[in-house]
Amino acid sequence: MMKTVEEQMAVIQRGAEEILVEKELIEKLKKGKPLKIKAGFDPTAPDLHLGHTVLINKLRQFQDLGHEILFLIGDFTAMIGDPTGKSATRPPLSEEDVLKNAETYKEQVFKILDPAKTKVVFNSEWMSKLSAADMIKLAGTTTVARMLERNDFGERYQSNTPIAIHEFLYPLVQGYDSVALDSDIELGGTDQKFNLLMGRTLQQHYGKEAQCTLTMPILEGLDGVQKMSKSLNNYIGIKDAPNDMFGKVMSVSDELMWRYFELLSFESLETIAGYKDAVANGENPRNIKIKLALELIERFHDKESAEAALKDFETRFSKNAIPDEMPEFTFNEVMPLANLLKEAGLVSSTSDGHRMVKQGAVKLNGEKVTDSRAPVENCEQQVYQVGKRKFARITVAA
């Protein structure tokens, strides 16, 4: 038996940024029938991170309320390239890459969604059947002026940055997906609002009942400033090793921890409020953060892995111990320390290496080093550490 409309709305509203139009959503729920809930993901990279799961978690909530989940893999749109938030044309992917990435998506999302209650669809199923005439008719449903209302398009137009015609097609294709699927609600990030509303417009144009839209916040990365992104290296990947996932969660600020609880945890709001009260009354935020780390690792791995990661964390970080196992490297040439750190994968670039040394975040056998340009000559099995979580055993035989 489905929950009351009021009970469902309480779940739906949790963490949501905006619901359009809320009155229409309530009327849809009053019908007492499972609604079609759509969310699209372009398989532009093989691995998902926790930022992606904000939407997937909301899909799971709808699923638990008894609604039908349409997990749309945008294999067709991925070959266009989503221009949302981009200051330049985004290169499209090959069909081979798209299909390969799509397979990994299915494997990863079912760590959250119930596969038996999830319908996975590919928008190439209907988009590849449209003729040139059909695409021209679709393009005729909107205007260039409407497209330029989108912030990114408008800014690029004002700055004389080229906008390719195929980029205008992206929101139209995403909107047409809603027509093809007869979706009742579409979910997306706040940066997708224009595209979601295009779905409403096109459904009305084709004589269908307009979908409601629900936007979720963009999750900040580990730095607490920019959106979580693999390219910014401020992400926690779904496929990260348990120990890495644990360490990354523990590295977030105490303030950001509550944001992660709200958007990533399946704990009730009452439970989270209890955690906040505990911290306000003197509980160490670290203890609460551990609960979040354990929950996420258990979700994406298993309980045993979560417990092992906690034990490793306590050994490695709480006691400032150097782990027994770490990557080992042998180099046959003398190079400056910053370059060595980059070659060993301890930093993302030599400039990052210089910066980390300057910040006092680099240690050699437990002792801080201060000269990032000092040449590293013949040495054997020296332990280098960057930050709290990165270690490597390095030999230089020049």
Swiss-Prot record:
Listed GO MF terms: ATP binding; RNA binding; tyrosine-tRNA ligase activity
Extent of motif 'KMSKS' region: 227-231
CC annotations in GO: cytosol
UniProt keyword terms in alphabetical order: Aminoacyl-tRNA synthetase, ATP-binding, Cytoplasm, Ligase, Nucleotide-binding, Protein biosynthesis, RNA-binding
Residue ranges constituting the S4 RNA-binding domain according to the UniProt record: 335-396
Location of this chain's protein in the cell: Cytoplasm
Any one GO biological process: tyrosyl-tRNA aminoacylation
Main location group: cytoplasm
Motif 'HIGH' region, residue numbers: 43-52
Reaction(s) the record says it catalyses: tRNA(Tyr) + L-tyrosine + ATP = L-tyrosyl-tRNA(Tyr) + AMP + diphosphate + H(+)
Entry coiled-coil feature ranges: none
Functional note: Catalyzes the attachment of tyrosine to tRNA(Tyr) in a two-step reaction: tyrosine is first activated by ATP to form Tyr-AMP and then transferred to the acceptor end of tRNA(Tyr).
Protein family: Belongs to the class-I aminoacyl-tRNA synthetase family. TyrS type 2 subfamily.
Record's subunit section: Homodimer.
Official protein name in the record: Tyrosine--tRNA ligase
